[in-house]
UniProtKB/Swiss-Prot annotation:
ATP binds at residues 30-37. It comes from Corynebacterium glutamicum (strain R). It comes from the Bacteria. GO terms for molecular function: ATP binding; single-stranded DNA binding. SUPFAM superfamilies: P-loop containing nucleoside triphosphate hydrolases. This is DNA replication and repair protein RecF.
Amino acid sequence: MHIRSLELRDYRSWPELKVDLEPGITVFIGRNGFGKTNIVEAIGYLAHLSSHRVSSDAPLVRAHAENARVSAVAVNQGRELAAHLLIKPHAANQASLNRTKVRTPRELLGVVKTVLFAPEDLALVKGEPAERRRYLDDIIATRQPRMAGVKADYDKVLKQRNALLKTATIALRRGYGTEEGAAALSTLDTWDGQLARLGAEVMAARFALLNELGPKIYEAYTTIAPESRPAAVNYKTTIDQGLSQFSEFDAGIIEATLLTELAAKRQREIERGSSLVGPHRDDVDLMLGDQPAKGFASHGETWSFALSLRIAEFNLLKSDDTDPILILDDVFSELDAGRRQKLVGIAQEVEQVLITAAVHDDLPENLKKVLTAQHTVTVQDTDTGRISLLDVQP
């Protein structure tokens, strides 16, 4: 897979960008803050409908603009698809595929497949559980676009359930002894059923994914850091004890176990006013030997583990018969010589690689020799603020 052309309008610092891309390795050179990362972020947003840098859409729209647009023509095994996404900071985003408007932007999932490695990926190892959950959910949505809808529905149910637990605390505590309490508990029962059903689908998909990813993560880490301890990953849930007797996890078993755990923790949830059970509280344990990587890994081991997660993701998507686009965002300056060479070796075997770097000297020498194209990103101050420009001679 590769992107043949990319167009941006009012996306962050880019009032307008039109660039033709080719298979091979393309690099965007520009000083920090000039807007080079915005280019690859836009491609990643088109692939995942989310940014690796921010959690909301508002920062993606250029100051004083009403919306932003990202358009790309993707080529996959000779077939071209044109994807267009309109990003609205205060309304629902809109999308079209081959100039035909689609019902929801989620229908674009899978049109562009990317794997992005960036300095922010250290948070996969050192950060909060939400980072690791998102890592899994993004891969699942890329491979099974329907699951993005399931996860969105789960999030809506969770929000409604939490709202009930917070606003109807007194009624819920009174229980079935009052009409108001009985009504609140009946509503909570309804949310419990939906939370368990949707949550079971999310968890089953995560379990299945980790079963595939685990060996690939181990292999990638062993290749990158052969002198280090072996890497392993384990899914950690709020219902671990209830599932421990099963060797395989299916949605039906998980749903029943979730319902049991929700019933057991109901009083605590009412007291705390929040949902204590479900995939929104799960985590992935990243292990080096018998120790968790978080808190025990060295800086080099942390980089190696983060890179291994992305390499495993890439290899998994590639095994689905599609070479995803590999994006390397300002990472070569952060890696030691050994890890740089490992990454160059991978990049040379990928159909399309997009790289950002602050200066040309950040690139390994053997990578410079195989570049397909190089673009320079600069900036210009205007009446409406600083804007980014591509390949403009001073």
